């Protein structure tokens, strides 16, 4: 009989919930980084700069929103399959979500950091010059504050989801426990779910 490491499952669920929350708040923080009037020092009229003026920030909003929904599905599947037989479609779905969700979060956070790691610059097309959004006005500082918070939250969500996936994989492959020689393979597989391509040591 394989003795399951029972703590792995609830801990992975906690990190999934944390990832969902961080991703959702990240999207909300970026969405509120809007309608902040920034005054340029080049004699041009005031310009309202929003997150939608930067493709990387738009991608972050879309990616974190999608990741939130997908991770919610993963949380449901991970929670509902406890105590039930593990069907192949569930495992395949979990593996797919485990690859897609971190990819969305890491790429969106990386793209946002590439644009606004230290400062955020906006290009004034009519005069062909750019200015610092963060330093141009108090409103610009507020805009950048929201953007930076959103970036770090997206990165935190990516780390949380990755750790949840690590615990899930570890539980499938190693955390099912050790198998005793007195039990049959069929009993160990059916009772503790030592499957999914992983083998229990006898």
UniProtKB/Swiss-Prot annotation:
The keyword Membrane applies. Its main location: membrane. It is found in: Cell membrane. The chain crosses the membrane at residues 11-31, 57-77, 95-115, 147-167. Keywords: Cell membrane, Membrane, Transmembrane, Transmembrane helix. It comes from the Eukaryota. Residues 32-56, 116-146 are extracellular. Pfam families: CASP_dom (PF04535). Residues 1-10, 78-94, 168-202 are cytoplasmic. It is a multi-pass membrane protein. InterPro entries: CASP/CASPL (IPR006459), CASP_dom (IPR006702), CASPL (IPR044173). One of its GO terms (cellular component) is plasma membrane. The keyword Membrane applies. Homodimer and heterodimers. Belongs to the Casparian strip membrane proteins (CASP) family. NCBIfam families: A_tha_TIGR01569. This is CASP-like protein 1U4. It comes from Sorghum bicolor (Sorghum).
